[in-house]
């Protein structure tokens, strides 16, 4: 099976609506990631078929819980979950933030080749970055704890509607119980990723103003 056929099969196991054009873009992204990974070491996942499950599907399944139009993906690495989500939701805007130059160089190439007008890669440390507009959501699968995420990113959420969307494995009960008093749990969603072994959750948090 081609990568495109593999991805189509994975998507068919979900409720996602993805066009052939979007599948083509997602495959182009995987091919670029696989090519650049050999020199830049952007991900520990080496097999493109495995990338479809662990990177593409894992990112796409987050989309159904997002609310809003403007998002920032903090510690995006090679563009995860930001690039797959930007392909799936062209009407939404994504800032992809990372402090490592080689990752941003790669992401600029992805944006150029895939003509993604709704993606802005930014090289910066999160604590030093100020967005031009308020974000509806801060996304991340990079932080080791929820406390770290809200501590480092709290200045990026400035509106009542703003939310933190944290991608985690098992339900992080201990981390939730250790959150500061001004951060509240809005929701948690168990995400079923086709062919992925292990639990996945999206934890939705907000600041109490």
Swiss-Prot record:
Reactions catalysed, as given in the entry: guanosine(527) in 16S rRNA + S-adenosyl-L-methionine = N(7)-methylguanosine(527) in 16S rRNA + S-adenosyl-L-homocysteine
Chain positions recorded as S-adenosyl-L-methionine binding sites: 75, 80, 126-127, 141
Protein EC: 2.1.1.170
GO cellular component: cytosol
Keyword rRNA-binding: no
An annotated Gene Ontology molecular function: rRNA (guanine-N7-)-methyltransferase activity
Keyword annotations of the record: Cytoplasm, Methyltransferase, rRNA processing, S-adenosyl-L-methionine, Transferase
Stored InterPro entries: rRNA_ssu_MeTfrase_G (IPR003682), SAM-dependent_MTases_sf (IPR029063)
Pfam families given in the database record: GidB
Broad EC category: transferase
Family annotation (SUPFAM superfamilies): S-adenosyl-L-methionine-dependent methyltransferases (SSF53335)
Subcellular location: Cytoplasm
Family: Belongs to the methyltransferase superfamily. RNA methyltransferase RsmG family.
Stated role: Specifically methylates the N7 position of guanine in position 527 of 16S rRNA.
Cited NCBIfam families: rsmG_gidB
Listed name of the protein: Ribosomal RNA small subunit methyltransferase G
Source organism: Colwellia psychrerythraea (strain 34H / ATCC BAA-681)
